[in-house]
A protein has these predicted regions:
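Amphipathic alpha-helical packing segments from all-alpha helical-bundle domains
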Residues: 108-128
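Helix-turn-helix
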Residues: 11, 15, 19-53, 57
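Short alpha-helical functional segments enriched in proximate histidine and acidic residues
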Residues: 19, 69, 90, 127
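N-terminal intrinsically disordered/low-complexity leader segments
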Residues: 1-7
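Helical hydrophobic small-molecule/effector-binding pocket
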Residues: 81-104, 110-112
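Amphipathic alpha-helical linker/stalk segments
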Residues: 56-82, 123
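Hydrophobic/aromatic residues within well-ordered alpha-helical segments
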Residues: 58-62, 66, 87, 94, ...
């Protein structure tokens, strides 16, 4: 008998990102994610005590992907222009993920001061 496939937290997060890309962040739930992984809902609920906890983890990963995407600028390009164009390009190429980041209410920062102090902003500011 072959060993059971192990479903990791990262696998769940990646599957949830795919659900968000295809259908929108509103459709991230235990059933849609487990269906994407071809498993029961048990592994999803094992790794995340609530669906909200899973959505927050997915949000953090999407935010990280967005930051990496924005920083893909060539050395000869003006950093401010490059970051701005990548911001727009991300919105065009990944509209569902862009909505998740900026319209879902899952943003960690609740004030301008928290946003400025965010570690994700350090490479953006360093490029300028």
């Amino acid at each position: 008998m072959p060993p059971k496939m192990r479903i990791t937290k990262d696998m769940i997060i990646n599957a949830a990102i795919e659900v968000a890309k295809q259908s929108g962040y509103e459709y991230i739930n235990a059933r849609t994610v487990s269906a994407r992984l071809h498993c029961s809902t048990q592994p999803v609920m094992y790794h995340f005590s609530t669906i909200d906890a899973m959505k927050r983890a997915v949000y953090a990963q999407v935010d990280h992907l967005h930051s990496e995407y924005m920083m893909r600028i060539s050395p000869e390009q003006d950093p401010i222009l490059g970051i701005g164009l990548n911001y727009i390009r991300f919105a065009v190429e990944e509209p569902q993920l862009f909505r998740y980041l900026f319209q879902s209410g899952y943003a960690v920062e609740h004030s301008l001061v928290e946003m400025i102090d965010s570690e994700e902003l350090i490479p953006v500011l360093a490029a300028m």
